[in-house]
């Protein structure tokens, strides 16, 4: 049974491994036996990663250099790097969406059958059905510059809540890309959709969403905010054989907030 969760002998790549969920995942992967872990980030991680490649996920050239350096044979790719909505719209989309796609498409052809791709999405992206047609239009644009131009041309949609929109794209991209990744390469693609997490990024989320909204969300799901370790455990699990039959799934990890919302057990009075 323990082999189901083992990372022994696996080549792993993780983006955003310096702080928060990524840093917690680095520790857990080491505990699970991973001895070939490459972290892509703009800052060097302090955890037990075996290799660090300085990478700017908003810059296609930087990503391409990382892909060349990584080489083939990646068993598990964690697309974890992300930014909050306090940044300019095009920057958020480049990091949270375009960078994820470029890295994935560069690494995937060299991944062995049975591998896994795990994206970090968010429950903030659960409104994707309302924008599905536009999101598929965006996903259908292969060229980086053209995709950035699409964001500018659709500024009213993208800028209304750019973080939420970027995570809508992340959820749809997970489903969309999972079809090709599994049919052509035998590689599963899933995402984790957390609620509010107690990480250094929380300050940016408070600026963007207000502390009242964050606390209200936590209060509606048991009153306990998620920790980086909570979500890292879910990420790490999705990269193992324990989730062998899962593909194209956006796994919600929010202490039950979405369940309460879906079943009309939410108290909106806390929003004022």
Model-derived segments and spans:
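N-terminal Rossmann NAD(P)H-binding glycine-rich loop of SDR-like oxidoreductase domains
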Residues: 18, 22-27
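Catalytic Tyr-x(3-8)-Lys segment
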Residues: 155-160, 211-230
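C-terminal substrate-recognition "lid" of short-chain dehydrogenase/reductases
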Residues: 224-253, 258
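Rossmann-fold cofactor-recognition segment
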Residues: 46-61
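Short, small/polar-rich loop/turn modules that mediate ligand/substrate recognition or access, typified
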Residues: 183, 188, 246-248
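Short C-terminal tail/terminal secondary-structure segment
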Residues: 2-3, 247-272
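Catalytic loop of short-chain dehydrogenase/reductase
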Residues: 84-85, 90, 113-184, 196-197
């Amino acid at each position: 049974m323990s082999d189901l969760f083992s990372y022994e002998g696996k080549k792993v790549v993780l983006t955003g491994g310096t702080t928060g969920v990524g840093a917690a995942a680095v520790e857990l992967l080491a505990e699970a036996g991973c001895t070939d872990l490459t972290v892509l980030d703009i800052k060097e991680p302090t955890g037990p990663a075996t290799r660090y490649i300085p990478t700017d996920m908003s810059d296609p050239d930087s990503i391409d250099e990382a892909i060349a350096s990584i080489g083939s044979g990646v068993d598990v790719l964690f697309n974890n790097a992300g930014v909050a909505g306090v940044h300019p719209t095009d920057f958020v989309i480049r990091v949270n969406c375009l960078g994820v796609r470029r890295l994935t498409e560069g690494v995937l052809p060299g991944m062995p059958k049975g591998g896994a791709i795990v994206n970090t999405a968010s429950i903030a992206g659960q409104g994707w059905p309302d924008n599905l047609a536009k999101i598929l239009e965006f996903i259908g644009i292969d060229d980086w510059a053209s995709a950035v131009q699409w964001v500018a041309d659709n500024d009213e949609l993208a800028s209304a809540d750019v973080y939420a929109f970027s995570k809508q794209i992340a959820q749809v991209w997970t489903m969309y890309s999972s079809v090709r990744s599994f049919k052509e390469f035998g590689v599963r693609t899933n995402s984790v959709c957390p609620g509010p997490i107690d990480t250094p990024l929380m300050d940016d989320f408070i600026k963007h969403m207000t502390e009242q909204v964050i606390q209200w969300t936590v209060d509606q799901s048991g009153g306990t905010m998620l920790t980086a370790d909570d979500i890292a455990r879910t990420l790490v699990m999705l990269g193992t054989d324990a989730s062998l039959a899962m593909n194209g799934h956006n796994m919600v990890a929010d202490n039950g907030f979405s369940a309460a919302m879906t079943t009309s057990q939410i108290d909106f009075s806390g929003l004022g």
